[in-house]
């Protein structure tokens, strides 16, 4: 096995230098770092993590003790737990137990301690009846070897607990049985010695006992479930089965469909959260991935920040209604939707089939390009065939009163939907002159995406320091952005691993203007200045345009024409940074992507990101406004919004950002949710009530950007010209 001494000899450096490089200390030249890393790779060096732990005296290791890794709820918990530890430099030791054999849990705890785990998250099978308990000492107090957090199953000897309200889950499922007027049901639970199972059972029975329903209770566990279920079905077939555990529900379904199938057997079960619709069961859902995420957070907060762990009950997700807001009295005539050609349009095409299945109403979706969309909206008239319109967020001010019906006049109850959305996606976009015209469908923001592996590489970090005497960090200004882009452009740095430092997206005039405005708003909050005047030829505007033109040197001459191109270019792995709207970012993770696992993301420099994306409204000329609004409410709310996001779209619903299956896959969405509140960039002061024609504005501005980019005009001349045109075209502001 290769040693530090072997590496030092091969690299021609001291052992101290090797140690500094391997421990990522920043006091070694880039040349020596490269020699050490090359030598370590050639020798197949593997760090001795055990020795490192002994030197430190502690590890950054947490143990997760699970009953099994077959059940979906435990898989979801672990994935949520791991996502948090990965982002906080902790490792996870996963251990499995046999709930019928306490010795397996004792062994798991002993192993965790032998590995010097600093914390343990455990679904314990121990209670007060056990003669020996690995978590408490002879006085009955919790041992202080490490932080221990009990998951889902409460214990009398510790309040270090996080879980769900299983008693409430039991009550809600019992209400379903009463609502369906069942007279004979099976209630299947795990061992009632576990607090969650006991709480569920008592919650269920406290409600069902008020009815005339006969309940046959079957108590089982993971090892006897098949036998117990088959024995019950041999004696009788109930009208429905109610279960405390999704794993049990799958067994009931498989056994019934294989051996006893006659009529459909309704199965109601407590279940992990499902992002996509699933029809096998009626599910009362619990967000186990969030449970895992918060469990890891609580442990790490206790260990690193001395924040005491308190007993926590998370809110149950409950019955999630995939057909909420749907008008089941809808006609069979198609609903017609006009939308921009984006990833969201394709996810809507797929999910609208659920709407059609429920109502019988076909949904026809027409997709058009950016410029075609404006023309189509501008030419709408009484003969228009469209019922629902997807309008770009920056066009709402101009189009809302011209072509949309106020939603609150169609159905005032729509105002209650606003509570489910991220607040900063509503005002000032959906509401015009006191009326609600649209609901947020795919609100997005421009974010900075970067190659995390390049920014964290010790060789490039040292090289950057040697060149600029500054640390290589995610840029917070566009001057820093260009400096880093230059560093990662092969033309200016031959050993750069990528050809270009950045992308530019400059297709149409509207797209080109976005690159300029992102830079302008890094320096000023809104389009108007402190005097409420719009000066497109100001010194700040000139700086923004020149900064953009400098980026030209660090980007491909074959610039991106649309945001899907930008996502694809970044995914190809030949660029260090890209600015991209989050509703297009899912394509970064396409099947051919070369950057999966190495995608970093941050707010755009200046921390005043531009908002983008689309909102849905009812056409002024629709003959079916109530049906159209019903569809919009269904499409924009939970759980459809989360399903759309999983398919590559984005959501305005707050609950989507608690779905860690989505957030783990598209982690930049969490940043986007928090960044909406930082979006300003308003075109006119609040006192101005004149509609602002965004399309015309970005057309003027984008032409100037393209003229300067192509060398036709100098920046100040182009800006003076666009200012003159702006004053002429927008003189009524």
Model-assigned labels for residue ranges:
Residues 1-2, 41-79, 88, 114, ...:
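N-terminal helix-turn-helix/winged-helix DNA-binding helices
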Residues 393-447, 598-602:
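Hinge/lid segment of periplasmic solute-binding proteins
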Residues 1-58:
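N-terminal helix-turn-helix DNA-binding module of bacterial transcription factors
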Residues 367, 671-726, 730:
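C-terminal capping/gating helix-and-loop segments adjacent to ligand/active sites or protein-protein/ligand interfaces
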Residues 305, 553, 591-658, 683-687, ...:
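Extracytoplasmic/periplasmic substrate-recognition and gating elements
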Residues 482-487, 519, 523-561, 589:
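Glycine-centered hinge/linker elements that transmit conformational signals in sensory
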Residues 435-441, 446, 476-533, 575:
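Extracytoplasmic/periplasmic solute-binding protein
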């Amino acid at each position: 096995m290769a040693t530090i001494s072997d590496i030092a000899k091969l690299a021609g450096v001291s052992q101290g230098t090797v140690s500094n490089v391997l421990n990522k200390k920043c006091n070694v030249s880039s040349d020596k770092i490269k020699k050490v890393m090359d030598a370590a790779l050639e020798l197949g060096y593997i760090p001795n993590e055990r020795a490192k732990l002994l030197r430190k005296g502690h590890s950054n290791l947490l143990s997760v003790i699970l009953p099994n890794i077959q059940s979906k709820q435990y898989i979801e918990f672990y994935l949520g737990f791991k996502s948090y530890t990965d982002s906080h430099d902790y490792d996870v030791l996963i251990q499995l137990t046999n709930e019928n054999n306490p010795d397996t849990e004792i062994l798991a705890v002993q192993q965790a301690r032998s590995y010097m785990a600093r914390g343990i998250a455990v679904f314990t099978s121990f209670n007060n009846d056990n003669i020996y308990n690995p978590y408490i000492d002879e006085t009955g107090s919790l041992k202080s070897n490490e932080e221990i957090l009990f998951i889902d199953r409460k214990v009398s000897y510790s309040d270090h607990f996080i879980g769900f309200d299983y008693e409430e889950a039991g009550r809600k499922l019992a209400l379903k049985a009463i609502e369906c007027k069942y007279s004979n049901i099976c209630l299947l639970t795990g061992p009632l010695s576990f607090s969650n199972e006991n709480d569920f059972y008592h919650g269920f029975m406290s409600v069902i006992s008020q009815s005339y329903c006969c309940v046959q209770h079957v108590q089982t566990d993971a090892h006897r479930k098949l036998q117990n279920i088959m024995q019950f079905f041999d004696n009788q077939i109930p009208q429905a089965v109610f279960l405390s555990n999704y794993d049990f529900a799958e067994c009931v379904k498989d056994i019934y469909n294989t051996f006893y199938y006659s009529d459909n057997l309704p199965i109601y079960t407590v279940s992990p959260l499902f992002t996509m619709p699933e029809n096998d069961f009626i599910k009362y859902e619990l967000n186990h991935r969030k449970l895992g995420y918060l469990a890891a957070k609580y442990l790490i907060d206790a260990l690193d920040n001395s924040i005491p762990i308190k007993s926590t009950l998370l809110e149950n997700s409950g019955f999630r209604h995939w057909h909420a807001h749907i008008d089941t009295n809808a006609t069979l005539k198609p609903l017609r939707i006009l939308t921009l050609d984006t990833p969201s349009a394709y996810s809507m095409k797929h999910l609208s089939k659920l709407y059609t299945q429920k109502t019988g109403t076909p949904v026809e979706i027409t997709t058009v390009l950016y410029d075609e969309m404006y023309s189509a909206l501008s030419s709408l008239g009484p003969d228009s065939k469209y019922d629902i319109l997807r309008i770009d967020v920056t066009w709402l001010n101009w189009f809302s009163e011209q072509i949309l019906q106020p939603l609150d006049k169609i159905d005032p109850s729509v105002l209650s939907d606003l509570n489910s959305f991220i607040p900063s996606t509503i005002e000032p976009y959906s509401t015009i002159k006191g009326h609600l015209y649209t609901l947020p469908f795919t609100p997005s923001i421009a974010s900075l995406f970067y190659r995390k592996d390049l920014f964290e590489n010790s060789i490039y970090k040292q090289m950057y320091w040697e060149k600029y005497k500054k640390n290589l960090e995610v840029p917070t200004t566009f001057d820093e952005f260009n400096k880093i882009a230059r560093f990662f452009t092969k033309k200016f740095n031959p050993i750069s691993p990528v050809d270009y430092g950045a992308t530019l997206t400059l297709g149409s005039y509207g797209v080109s203007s976005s690159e300029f405005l992102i830079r302008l708003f890094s320096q000023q909050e809104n389009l108007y200045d402190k005097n409420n005047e719009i000066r497109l030829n100001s010194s700040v505007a000139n700086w923004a345009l020149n900064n953009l033109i400098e980026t030209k040197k660090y980007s491909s001459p074959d610039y991106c024409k649309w945001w899907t191109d930008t996502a694809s270019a970044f995914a190809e792995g030949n660029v260090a940074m890209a600015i991209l709207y989050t509703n297009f970012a899912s394509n970064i993770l396409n099947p051919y992507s070369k950057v999966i696992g190495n995608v970093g993301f941050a707010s755009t420099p200046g921390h005043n990101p531009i908002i983008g994306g689309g909102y849905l409204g009812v056409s002024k000329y629709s003959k079916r406004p109530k049906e159209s609004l019903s569809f919009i409410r269904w499409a924009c709310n939970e759980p459809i919004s989360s399903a759309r996001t999983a398919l590559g779209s984005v959501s305005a619903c707050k609950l989507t950002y608690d779905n860690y299956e989505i957030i783990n896959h598209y982690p930049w969405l969490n940043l986007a949710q928090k960044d909406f509140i930082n979006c300003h960039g308003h075109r006119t002061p609040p006192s101005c009530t004149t509609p602002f024609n965004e399309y015309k504005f970005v057309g003027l501005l984008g032409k100037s950007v393209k003229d300067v980019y192509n060398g036709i005009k100098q920046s100040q001349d182009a800006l003076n010209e666009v200012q003159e045109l702006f004053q002429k075209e927008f003189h009524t502001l």
